[in-house]
Amino acid sequence: MKEHSFYQFALTVRGRKDSKGDLAEEIFNDLSFPKHEKDFNQLSDYIEMQSDISVPMSEFDDLYEEYIEWLKF
């Protein structure tokens, strides 16, 4: 199982031509994003309360699920 943070996973999604790619790009451009965080609740709280990320939270939920699957391989 991989030991990468959500941020590291998001970097692999940058460049996709969909809303998940848009979210990954916004995460990359957010200099305050918690780059070493893995916890869903911590990341979700940050996006909802502290960031200017404009992608719907449902996209974050979907991308986080993809992250969990990605960690398995």
From Swiss-Prot:
- List the Gene3D superfamilies hit by this protein, alphabetically: YozE SAM-like
Highest taxon in the source lineage: Bacteria
Check the record and name the InterPro entries matching this protein. UPF0346, YozE_SAM-like, YozE_SAM-like_sf
Which Pfam families is this protein grouped with? Answer: YozE_SAM_like
Return the similarity comment. Answer: Belongs to the UPF0346 family.
Q: What is this protein called?
A: UPF0346 protein SH1485
Write the lineage as a comma-separated list.
Bacteria, Bacillati, Bacillota, Bacilli, Bacillales
